[in-house]
Design a protein with these regions (language model features):
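Bacterial N-terminal signal peptides
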Residues: 1-8
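C-terminus-biased signal that marks the final domain/tail of proteins
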Residues: 14-29, 37, 42-43, 141, ...
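A contiguous strand-loop segment
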Residues: 15-113, 153, 352
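Surface loops and adjacent helix of pleckstrin homology
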Residues: 33, 173-174, 183, 311-313
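Compact, glycine/acidic-enriched structural inserts
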Residues: 45-63, 105-145, 330-342
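Acidic/His-rich structured neighborhood in mature extracellular/periplasmic domains
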Residues: 87, 92-122, 142-203
Length: 352
């Protein structure tokens, strides 16, 4: 299975939801899901040391694009191939994530004469994590490269970058032009574009946290059926615009937790609401993969304390990778599957 097959085969199965939370101790947490119902993504975590050199794929799936060497060490989570890091954090606290963006982005056409500065969209996260420490540096680095697709059938993607200062930006490439947007809200999903998603929030200006007050409607007394009716009308489907709205409201109404650890746990709790069952994405009776969930993994990244947390469709226990415990000047490149076993463990309860 190749990335081209993944993102061209069934666009309706590709989804991602990202949120941002701030802790009372000033820790910054970015968290996200990644969905794909067509096949197992064979995801891995990778540890990339300083000085490690990679080369980009180009159309035809050959490793003949630009070469890039990591100035900073980083940890990333990949899909399908270890080179395709779609979420990661580097030792300076820069976070980067790739989100599907079908139907709205357009990269420039690949030009073989520019291959030494051409990089595939699925390796851009790796390049920027290894090269940059701030969002301003990300902007400058993107100007120097040509972002291309490996496969002309492929969906495009867009990206979220956040640095230690708290600034977060979104990158979308439309008509071959890189467009950056400040993301003060800290939410990202998929298509349409980020500006449209932010404008669409205005359609839900009537929503609020809490419960609607009882009042008279003529001679009839009306009262809410239950708590939380201030959110009545929030969209509940799994399309990107609906997920964007829900993520925005769930994130902004969540009570601030005192610590980074509490905020990480809160991020996972919020993102529970965005898990996508396999069956709803395809026609009735059509099954594309023997996997337990279309939401294949969820991550929360503590940018301040430099720890990546993740859980998967096979194991909902939360695991962590602490970048502070990695010496990026001495370690070797390493990659391993996110799961050692592909089955949710059951833990017996001692009854006496």
């Amino acid at each position: 299975m190749t990335i081209g097959m993944i993102i061209s085969g069934h666009q309706q199965t590709t989804a991602c939801t990202g949120i941002t939370l701030n802790a009372g101790d000033n820790a910054r947490i970015v968290a996200r899901t990644i969905e794909w119902g067509g096949s197992e993504l064979n995801s891995r975590y990778v540890i990339v040391p300083r000085g490690y050199t990679q080369r980009s794929y180009i159309p035809g799936y050959t490793l003949d694009g630009m070469s890039f060497t990591a100035k900073y060490g980083y940890v990333g989570l990949s899909v399908e191939q270890k080179e395709f890091v779609v979420e990661g954090l580097n030792e300076t606290g820069l976070s980067a994530g790739l989100f599907y963006f079908p139907g709205y982005g357009q990269y420039e056409e690949y030009d073989a004469s520019l291959k030494d500065s051409s990089i595939t969209d699925f390796q851009l996260v790796s390049y920027l994590l290894g090269s940059c420490s701030t969002t301003d540096e990300v902007k400058e680095a993107v100007k120097k490269v040509h972002v291309i697709a490996i496969d002309p059938r492929s969906s495009t993607v867009h990206w979220r970058f956040a640095d230690a200062s708290g600034r977060q930006i979104v990158l979308e490439i439309v008509n071959g032009e890189a467009r950056f947007y400040d993301n003060k809200l800290g939410v990202l999903t998929n298509s349409p574009g980020f500006e449209w998603q932010m404008t669409n929030l205005n359609n839900y200006v009537n929503l609020y946290s809490g419960t609607a007050e009882a009042h008279k409607f003529g001679d009839v007394q009306l009262a809410s059926f239950g708590a939380g009716s201030g959110f009545l009308g929030i969209p509940g489907d799994v399309t990107p615009p609906s997920r964007f709205v829900r993520a925005a409201f769930f994130q902004t109404t969540a009570p601030k937790q005192a610590t980074a650890a509490g905020t990480v746990r809160q991020a996972f709790q919020i993102l529970n609401n965005f898990d996508i069952p396999v069956g709803i994405e395809f026609p009735a009776g059509e099954v594309h993969a023997d996997i337990p969930s279309a939401t294949q993994w969820t991550t929360a990244t503590d940018m301040t304390n430099k720890v990546i947390y993740y859980r998967t469709m096979y194991d909902s226990s939360i695991r962590s990778i602490d970048l502070n415990k990695i010496d990026f000047t001495k370690c070797k490149y390493f990659n391993a599957p996110l799961d050692k076993t592909k089955e949710q463990p059951f833990i017996p309860v001692k009854t006496r």
